[in-house]
Amino acid sequence: YGLLVGSECISRHLDMTDRSSCILFGDGAGAAVIELDDSRAYTSLFGCHGDLDVINCTNKAGERSLVHMEGQATYKFAVSTVPKLIESVVKKAGLTLDDIDVFICHQANARIVDAVARHLKLPKDKFFMNLHEYANTSAASLAIALSDAIEKGICKRGQTLLLTGFGAGKTWGAVVIDF
């Protein structure tokens, strides 16, 4: 068994006067117990650009570190990276895009998820979205989205799911799972 946990209390690190960033994020936590089935292949891919210059958390003593989102740069990064990642992990699993019943992407931005679906020529309804309910919960978004999709009956036993995320440090990852 494995435990997938994501939690974020990002509101402590937001400048509430910076409307370009503060309205994008929400606090949250999610968890799932995952069992590896020895009769099934486990397929995942992870990567990063390897340049940690994009993460700059320096601050003066006594000052709060604040999050600032570079929205356009994040959009370009995600839209150029996530579709290729999805295609690669699906191919590695020996599947096609049509074999995936539900795609659950990091809930960063609806425009990003829509662009990924368009790039892959897939209907948007195959991509679960709950961003409108929770905002971008950062590290918690995939665990929350998976839990929410299960509770809402979107993910059903026997389906093949693809979870994919991206984030700080220009990192990315995807996993194909049988539910």
Task: Describe the function of each predicted region.
Residues 1-22, 45-63, 108-118, 137-144:
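Active-site-adjacent elements of ketosynthase-type condensing enzymes
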Residues 1-2, 63-68, 147-156:
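A polyampholytic, Gly/Pro-enriched intrinsically disordered region
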Residues 1-3, 30-32, 40, 102, ...:
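Structural motif
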Residues 2-8, 34-35, 163-167:
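Short beta-strand segments
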Residues 16-80, 84-87, 166, 179:
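Condensing-enzyme catalytic core mediating Claisen C-C bond formation in acyl metabolism
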Residues 81-92, 115, 119, 145:
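Phosphate/ATP-binding catalytic cores across multiple sugar-kinase/actin-like superfamilies
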Residues 84-101, 149-154:
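Phosphate/pyrophosphate-binding loops at sites that engage ATP/ADP/AMP, CoA/4′-phosphopantetheine
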Residues 101-179:
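Claisen-condensing/thiolase-fold acyl-transfer catalytic domains that form or cleave C-C bonds
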